[in-house]
Each structure stands twice: as C-alpha cells, then as structure tokens.
Amino acid sequence: MHILFYGNCQQGALRRMLNMLKHDYICCHNTDITETDLVNQLCKYDIIITQPIADNYRHKSYLSTKFVLEHCKKDCKIIIVDVIYFDFYYFDLTYTHFNNSRLTKPGDYHYTCMQECYKNGNNISYYINNIVNNIHFKHTDELEDTANNSLRELKRRYEANKKTYIGSNIHFVYTGDYIRSNYKHKLLFYSMNHPSKYLLQFVCESILDLLDIPNTTINYDMDPLSSTKCIMYKCIQPCVFFDIMKCEPAMYQTNNIKDICELYYNVYNEIQLC
C-alpha cells in the first residue's frame, strides 16, 4: 500500500503524527516539481490524503486538487481534509506584504495592532499593557461572532468541496463540528492555520476510520506544529474554560512576549514600516 500526503504543512504534520514517514509527502507549495514528474508519481499511489487546492495554484495548473484527481489511479482512494483554520484565538493575526512580497521576518505571521502601535509611535510596553493584557480589549460577543464566522466558513467550504470533488473513491474529513465542540475547552490552534495536537489527533483518527486501519499508529505525544505559537490576547480568557496563561507564545526558542515583540519591532525598524 503506497500513500501520498499532498498539500501544505498540515499534511506533513498528519503524516508525522500517523507515523507514516515511510510514505511520501509532496508539498503543494513546491513549484520546482514539473508536471511530468508529478503525473509519474501520482500513478504510484493507492491512497492520496490531500486538501482542496485551487486551480492554477501558484500559477501552476498541475498543483491543484482537480489535477491530482484526474491523474491518480482510477481505484486510488482519495481523502480530502479541510484546509484547517480558525480566526478566534488570534483574531488580530495577519499576513503582511512589503515591497510587493510577503514579509516573512521575523516570521510568517504579524499582528495588526502591533503594527498600528509601531506606526503610531507607541512602544512595546504600550502594546502589551493596552492590547495583549487588556481583558476588555474585545467584548465576548464580538469574539464569539469571530468564532462562528470561521465555523460557518468551514462549513461553506466543506459543502462546496463535496459538490466540486465527486466520486465513489473520494472521502472527506470535516473539522468544523469538532472545533465547535472543543474550542472553548482546549487550545486547538497555535496560529489561525496551525492546529495543535488535539485537532490533528482528531483528523488522524478520522483518516484511519476511513481507511479501516486499526488505531495503532498515532503518536499522541507529538505536537508537530508547536514550534511557533502566536500571542493570544487576554480578552480571550472570558470566552474559554482553559487557562490561557498556560498557553505561552513561542518564537525562536523564547516564550517571553516582550522579547517576541522586540523581534517584530526590530524588523519594522529595519524596513522602516510606515
């Protein structure tokens, strides 16, 4: 049985947690792979675990889920997992562009309010005291609206995917119900799109159920996307039942919020963000 995990870092994390490192992983971000190479590889697999990848992704028609389905073996079993995301915990998180390119220093993720503080001449202490540690920064109703908006969007995408990718060999893993039932009880994400081990465990269990494989492979101790943990604002605390003070941020081997903020401010000074 040959299995391919095809997609973003979430697929790579699932492969590791399932202890399936002997099976292949192709990152959909990799534009170096040629169409011919991908076609030659796809025909080898009995099972492909993937996610919805748009047509003409990164200006390459062959990186899409549609292309994968068209060129895999006819009897290949396909499992399509949600592109997992949730805005609730890190509602201020964003991607930033500078000089027409995504700004990936000091990391992929940036904080809108931190950038506004920097641009307005407010120092790091102001950002931490008035935003990060301000339990009243966002009202609980507004935060729960954010959670519900993400859940509705996950459901909308799931229903659209079922209409787009059709076949008796195609199966889906939907994460919205699990997130809705659990997001207040345990931390399910380290960024808006890096799930914690709890959500990855649910997806792994769902995959094994669909494959009718006994659950003897999942590494429940592994937390594969935990190397970077974003800053969670204290206003989240009234909305959840777990202690967010135990959910420390992590970046470049530091858990200190001030040190993490300094990394960002140094980059913004360097590029003269305005």
Predicted regions and their residues:
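Extracellular glycan-modifying ectodomains
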Residues: 1-274
